[in-house]
Structure formats: structure tokens, C-alpha cells
């Protein structure tokens, strides 16, 4: 499989993608971040999003992918379930895992329901809208991406501002009180 048309021009990463594809629970893999939008440079990492029926254990992922990495932290949860790695050739790769059913409910809630969440509502939307499908066994990711190809709804914009404004200042859990 040749991923070059998707701005993946790294043989080591192609092997990782093929290894991920071999897992039964993996339904789709997409390229996100600057590599998917054309804004990357020679220092850019790869952001790989793996959509699964069930997220493989960190141990399974380490056994499958560890041989391709010179440095790796499997099973991090800073933002989502993720593996933060540097490939054997020195290229940094973040691999983010999403459960299809759970993520599908989240997308429905945001896009169809207009519900805002703290901080990352627009980031998730941008990610889905601009990611490149590397493979999609079931059509799941393509469905998510197609849902995101609409104009940003006014009710969601208003909900994001209202929801996140309270985090900035004036409330007990606001950021301004936390950093004092």
C-alpha cells in the first residue's frame, strides 16, 4: 500500500500503518494535523488517528509497534488514548486511538445537537473535517468526515462561547483563580 498520495512519505511509518491495519479491532486510520492540511514542514510530526471497535491495550500496541520506535510512551492519556513515539528514523509520531461508538456519539452531540464541551469542540471538528483517510475498512471515518463538511452552526458557536467563557474568569473554577 502506498501512502505517499496522503503526504506520508516515510517507509518506517508506512510499516506502522500496515501493522495497525492488521489489527481486527481497527476500522479506520486517518492522517491529521499539519501533514493533512499541507501546513507541515521538515520538523512536523505525524498525527495518526486510529478508529477502533475497541482500543487495543497499551501492551498489544507496544508489542506491535515498539520495534519501529527509538523512543516510545505507550498508553498515555494527556488528551486522548495515545502513543507518543519517535520512529527509528527520528520522525516523531503521535498515534491517537478513538473508539468508534463513543466518538460517533460525541460527533452527533456536537454537530447535530450543538453541544459544546470545554476547550476542544472546534479542535475535534477541524481534525475530522481536514484529516485524510489512509484506510477505512467499514466506512466509519468517512461517515464522520462527511458529517463535518457543513458550515459551522450558529447555535454551536454560541454554546462554545458561553461554555468556555466561564472557564476564563469570574467563576470559582475559572482559570484566572487557578493560576493565582
PLM features: what roles do these ranges have?
Residues 2-5, 69-179:
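Conserved NTP/Mg2+-binding pocket subregion across the NTase superfamily
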Residues 32-67, 82-97:
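Catalytic metal-binding acidic patch
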